[in-house]
Swiss-Prot record:
NAD(+) binds at residues 32-36, 81-82, 113, 136, 173, 290, 314. DNA ligase that catalyzes the formation of phosphodiester linkages between 5'-phosphoryl and 3'-hydroxyl groups in double-stranded DNA using NAD as a coenzyme and as the energy source for the reaction. It is essential for DNA replication and repair of damaged DNA. The active site is at 115 (n6-amp-lysine intermediate). It comes from the Bacteria. It catalyses: NAD(+) + (deoxyribonucleotide)n-3'-hydroxyl + 5'-phospho-(deoxyribonucleotide)m = (deoxyribonucleotide)n+m + AMP + beta-nicotinamide D-nucleotide. Pfam families: BRCT, DNA_ligase_aden, DNA_ligase_OB, DNA_ligase_ZBD, HHH_2, HHH_5, Nlig-Ia. This is DNA ligase. SUPFAM superfamilies: BRCT domain (SSF52113), DNA ligase/mRNA capping enzyme, catalytic domain (SSF56091), Nucleic acid-binding proteins (SSF50249), RuvA domain 2-like (SSF47781). One of its GO terms (biological process) is DNA replication. One of its GO terms (cellular component) is cytosol. GO terms for molecular function: DNA binding; DNA ligase (NAD+) activity; metal ion binding.
Amino acid sequence: MDSIEQQLTQLRTTLRHHEYLYHVMDAPEVPDAEYDRLMRELRELEAQHPELVTPDSPTQRVGAAPLASFSQVRHEVPMLSLDNVFDEESFLAFNKRVQDRLKSADTLTWCCELKLDGLAVSILYENGLLVRAATRGDGTTGEDITANVRTIRAIPLTLRGDNIPARLEVRGEVFLPQKGFEKINDEARRTGGKIFANPRNAAAGSLRQLDPRITAKRPLTFFCYGVGILEGGVLPDTHLGRLLQFKEWGLPVSNRVQLCDSPEAVLAFYHKVEEDRPSLGFDIDGVVIKVNSLALQEQLGFVARAPRWAVAFKFPAQEQMTFVRDVEFQVGRTGAITPVARLEPVQVAGVLVSNATLHNADEIARLGLRIGDKVVIRRAGDVIPQVVNVVESERPDDTREIVFPAHCPVCGSDVERVEGEVVTRCTGGLICGAQRKEALKHFVSRRALDVDGMGDKIIDQLVEKEYVHTPADLFRLSAGKLTGLDRMGPKSAQNVVNALEKAKETTFARFLYALGIREVGEATAAGLAAHFGTLEQLEKATIDDLQKVPDVGIVVATHVFNFFAEESNRDVIGKLLEEGIHWPAPVVINVEEIDSPFAGKTVVLTGSLSQMSRDDAKARLVAIGAKVAGSVSKKTDLVIAGEAAGSKLAKAQELGIDVIDEAEMLRLFGE
């Protein structure tokens, strides 16, 4: 018996630990499925040994004690939880138990709803006015969150309509839609705030702020699903009727509610909701199935912690626990280096998961993750599996630190992480196999070297057949080799070779743009070319030198400096020059000798032009001594606004910068 008592004590201690983390700290350490498994184990053991059941066992109550920082509210009608079923067989057994208890073979009518994944709350209305709101807490005592609930726009402060009871306590779920969850985390990443693991944690954390002004900024919403206190009024005698009455009084109710007259209809509803789950826009973890008749509900009654007339039919768990066996680093097509956790394979939501993205170094630090850790994995819908949190209380002794590579795992080039960015990137854009296709497609594009006839599909084949590894290899292609590609005849192949030969004559600005240096667009490339004049001068430039170019700040300057510091990039540039790529020598423009109102001014073009292309306008402006920048700043002298000018025009007006339209530009050109 001692061993049974020890098992019970251990299970209760473990469950209380997880209840505290879930209900009080809003930081669950294990997925719901693991908590449910432990609870089932405890309930089964207590059923076998009823003499060992204690009043404070987790099976005898709901949740954990409230935080001391909120005033406490005693629920006049306890807020109970629901028992769970996890498969069709268990639901059918529940259905039979209900019919047996009712001593009836008549078909039951079930009311089926979504099981929302948020925070259960009680809201008390007196004479139609919201007077108090509370969390479930331990089911008997909750926390007073009235001030915070009043900030949720979905919850009416005053009920509308007729026949409103003198005292009405509605119960429901406060939750956070997925778009709101993403918005909160995006803002937290930007400001260095707390990143939430999932919408449920974000909703709980938002609702239990001591400062209601913080809660008011969070896009929380609410669905009503039940009633507690009812005094001085009458409600319909069915569950669905009550939901419809709540809706008439202005309380939000889910539109996914359905009456089912058979167990088969309930199962069909369950599977349809499971299918629609990814497109709902908010998290659910199952469906709730209730006897629709209030009279039958009263006849069925309650057990210690749950009603006999309702059950939660939960979906396969979207979270599971496993171990991180290793971390590998993948390089994306833009050079982003992403850490990927190699996991002990585990079934999550019906899929065997063996890998999970770790996003970046900041995410690893936030998680406090080490190789060998026990972790919670989440897979929702089609989302790539990710690590939600580390189970630090079960950390093995032999875990290892995760070290980000100093060199690209594909090509060996240096990696960079610019201040203010979360992504670590490979700097070997011209040689890295992982970036090869995108780098080549950019190199031959119309605004770069403009190789006519060299489309994306040709580049794909050239890379896949390993005919081309760097941009310099393009200029060694023969018509004979190109003829071996799909849909490439001798004439088309020769045309591509001719186009490559023609592309060797370019401009310094186009060449710089074609190199694909991160953050260097056409305008920045033109500015760099105009400022430094020669490739030799640009390659020698320091980060401080680079920031003297209009529209080049510390981030762009760092990217440019790191690009030319990488030896492999300089090697490819050397080979391109050996293949005959060239451009005219720089023309030194003496601004003082140019008779133009644009000479010496930093100009920004925005909007669309009708009389000439943006490229032609830029070329004209540079030729008459202007510096053309890509964004508006205090250094900008003039903005030329075409049709549908947007944020750049607004910023110019805000900074008091002179603005002219296309017609005035042409007049100043002398046209």
